[in-house]
């Protein structure tokens, strides 16, 4: 039946072709040939090219205006007005030929120029040389790396630790090692730039909550819980992370960790804790914000910190359960594809840990000095102190902005410069303004170390007050 129908249709088509007018057939034939020509012909011919005359060439050359190799830079750009630091950035440092008390460098425990740390680094240099010439998985693992990881794990009372050769890359590599596309990350709006880069690399769904606002975080968690109920199948494969800092780099405030742990278990999320400022600072033994609050470290899924603030070294580490850390050895980009930490810096970090364990009273001394200068800087007309009294790095911001960020920066820089002239070394907090998700207001960052005496702290506070009054009033 189907064959007969097809034959009948074919007969009808042939009959219609015979009955069609001649002009109709000619037009369709021309169109078919034109389509074939368009399909197989080139859009241009190499031979069809007209050469410019000498006069036309000269006119084009005269009209051409080359772009500058380097864009114009204003004379007040920070890159053109730099300070020259001579010697190590220890308790006192020489800036532009003048000895200053250093309130700018992250050297909380004063170990940068510690003789024991220097001796350990020198001995390692003589034994191993300078570098390792490869990543950890490609002949870049030395025994001193394994010793440092073991010491860090024991110090933090975790199962295992992993070290990175660059502090910034530690949390920036750890986050995308676990959080992938489709996962959800709840992160504080004041998170540091390293966390932001890690989130960007993860390509996860990012939800920002107000700084240290647990009510706002719970609101977001509840909203996500409602979304999960609409699609249970998707929810089963979607992981939820909460990323916070122990002490926030951009605000100097401490995270409310006990409340975060409660929300973690209530809404089945994982906590990543960045402790670059709180490690070696908070807690009776310097173990960070978990020890400060008395929280079981197993309640935190991953702890990250750099070794550049308290340990007088370079690099960073992550610690936690063994299965969490082992995953980074194959998935942590900064671990797999960067040359490993130079052995001399690993040896320096081990010796710094020895000093911390032998002298736990150093943390109480640091806390006392932080409180002293924090109190002394209160009540400065035109400036406000931003940060906790126990934080060794806090900010001085303008009480009222001028309405222009550039003008605010200039005012604060004038304060910094005049303090420098009076032998107090300070610095502004610097940001990549176009890259920051939530750009903090301009500020002067003040960093405290255990080596600063009470007299030096009082002198710094009085100098800042006098200079601020002269500049702002």
Swiss-Prot record:
Bilayer topology: Single-pass membrane protein
Documented effect of changing residue 310 to G: Found in a patient with HSAN1A; uncertain significance
Phenotype upon changing residue 331 to Y: In ALS27 and HSAN1A; reduced canonical activity towards serine and increased production of deoxysphingolipids
Residue spans, topological domain Lumenal: 1-15
UniProt induction comment: Expression at protein level is highly increased in brains of patients with Alzheimer disease. No changes are observed at mRNA level.
Domain of life: Eukaryota
Co-factor requirement: pyridoxal 5'-phosphate
Ranges annotated as spanning the membrane: 16-36
Keywords: Acyltransferase, Amyotrophic lateral sclerosis, Disease variant, Endoplasmic reticulum, Lipid metabolism, Membrane, Neurodegeneration, Neuropathy, Phosphoprotein, Pyridoxal phosphate, Sphingolipid metabolism, Transferase, Transmembrane, Transmembrane helix
Expressed in which tissues: Widely expressed. Not detected in small intestine.
Regulation: SPT complex catalytic activity is negatively regulated by ORMDL proteins, including ORMDL3, in the presence of ceramides. This mechanism allows to maintain ceramide levels at sufficient concentrations for the production of complex sphingolipids, but which prevents the accumulation of ceramides to levels that trigger apoptosis.
Result, substituting residue 144 to D: In HSAN1A; reduced canonical activity towards serine; does not affect the interaction with SPTLC2
Biological pathway: Lipid metabolism; sphingolipid metabolism
Keyword ATP-binding set for record: no
Region annotation (Interaction with SPTLC2) ranges: 1-66
Medical condition linked: Amyotrophic lateral sclerosis 27, juvenile: A form of amyotrophic lateral sclerosis, a neurodegenerative disorder affecting upper motor neurons in the brain and lower motor neurons in the brain stem and spinal cord, resulting in fatal paralysis. Sensory abnormalities are absent. The pathologic hallmarks of the disease include pallor of the corticospinal tract due to loss of motor neurons, presence of ubiquitin-positive inclusions within surviving motor neurons, and deposition of pathologic aggregates. Neuropathy, hereditary sensory and autonomic, 1A: A form of hereditary sensory and autonomic neuropathy, a genetically and clinically heterogeneous group of disorders characterized by degeneration of dorsal root and autonomic ganglion cells, and by prominent sensory abnormalities with a variable degree of motor and autonomic dysfunction. The neurological phenotype is often complicated by severe infections, osteomyelitis, and amputations. HSAN1A is an autosomal dominant axonal form with onset in the second or third decades.
Family: Belongs to the class-II pyridoxal-phosphate-dependent aminotransferase family.
UniProt domain comment: The transmembrane domain is involved in the interaction with ORMDL3.
Subunit structure: Component of the serine palmitoyltransferase (SPT) complex, which is also composed of SPTLC2 or SPTLC3 and SPTSSA or SPTSSB. The heterodimer consisting of SPTLC1 and SPTLC2/SPTLC3 forms the catalytic core of the enzyme, while SPTSSA or SPTSSB subunits determine substrate specificity. SPT also interacts with ORMDL proteins, especially ORMDL3, which negatively regulate SPT activity in the presence of ceramides. Forms dimers of heterodimers with SPTLC2. Interacts with RTN4 (isoform B).
Role description: Component of the serine palmitoyltransferase multisubunit enzyme (SPT) that catalyzes the initial and rate-limiting step in sphingolipid biosynthesis by condensing L-serine and activated acyl-CoA (most commonly palmitoyl-CoA) to form long-chain bases. The SPT complex is also composed of SPTLC2 or SPTLC3 and SPTSSA or SPTSSB. Within this complex, the heterodimer with SPTLC2 or SPTLC3 forms the catalytic core. The composition of the serine palmitoyltransferase (SPT) complex determines the substrate preference.
Protein name according to UniProt: Serine palmitoyltransferase 1
Lineage: Eukaryota, Metazoa, Chordata, Craniata, Vertebrata
Gene: SPTLC1
């Amino acid at each position: 039946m189907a064959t007969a129908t097809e034959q009948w249709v074919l007969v009808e088509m042939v009959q219609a072709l015979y009955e069609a007018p001649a002009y109709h057939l000619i037009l369709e034939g021309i169109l078919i040939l034109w389509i074939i020509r368009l399909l197989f012909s080139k859009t241009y011919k190499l031979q069809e090219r007209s050469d410019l005359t000498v006069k036309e060439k000269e006119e084009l050359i005269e009209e051409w205006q080359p772009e500058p190799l380097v864009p114009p830079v204003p004379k007040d750009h920070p890159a053109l007005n730099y300070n020259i630091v001579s010697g190590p950035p220890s308790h006192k440092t020489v800036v532009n030929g003048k000895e200053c008390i250093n309130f700018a460098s992250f050297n909380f425990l004063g170990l940068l120029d510690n003789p024991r740390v220097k001796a350990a680094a020198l001995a390692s240099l003589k034994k191993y040389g300078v570098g390792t010439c490869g990543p950890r998985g490609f002949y870049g693992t030395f025994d001193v790396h394994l010793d440092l990881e073991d010491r860090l794990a024991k110090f933090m009372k975790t199962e295992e630790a992993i070290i990175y050769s660059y502090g910034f890359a530690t949390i920036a590599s750890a986050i995308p090692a676990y959080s992938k596309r489709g996962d959800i990350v709840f992160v504080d709006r004041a998170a540091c730039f390293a966390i932001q880069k890690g989130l960007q690399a993860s390509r996860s769904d990012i939800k920002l909550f107000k700084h240290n606002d647990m009510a706002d975080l719970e609101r977001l968690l509840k909203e996500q819980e409602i979304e999960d109920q609409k699609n249970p199948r998707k929810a089963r494969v979607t992981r939820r992370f909460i990323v916070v800092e122990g002490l926030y780099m951009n605000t100097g405030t401490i995270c409310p960790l006990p409340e975060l742990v409660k929300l973690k278990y209530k809404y089945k999320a994982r906590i990543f804790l960045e402790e670059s400022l709180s490690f070696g600072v908070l807690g009776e033994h310097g173990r960070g914000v978990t020890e400060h609050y008395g929280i079981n470290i197993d309640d935190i899924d991953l702890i990250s910190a750099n070794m550049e603030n308290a340990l007088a070294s370079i690099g960073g580490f992550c610690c936690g359960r063994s299965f969490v850390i082992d995953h980074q050895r194959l998935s942590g980009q900064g671990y797999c594809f960067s040359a490993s930490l130079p052995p001399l810096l690993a040896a320096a970090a081990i010796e710094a840990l020895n000093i911390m364990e032998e002298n736990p009273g150093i943390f109480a001394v640091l806390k006392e000095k932080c409180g002293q200068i924090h109190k002394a800087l209160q009540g400065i007309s035109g400036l406000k102190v931003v940060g906790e009294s126990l934080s060794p790095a806090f900010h001085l911001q303008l009480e009222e902005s001028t309405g222009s960020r550039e003008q605010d920066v200039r005012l604060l820089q004038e304060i910094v410069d005049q303090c420098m002239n009076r032998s107090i070394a300070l610095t502004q907090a610097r940001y990549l303004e176009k890259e920051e998700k939530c750009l903090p207001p301009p500020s002067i960052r003040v960093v405290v170390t255990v080596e600063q005496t009470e007299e030096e702290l009082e002198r710094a506070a009085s100098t800042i007050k006098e200079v601020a009054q002269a500049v702002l009033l």
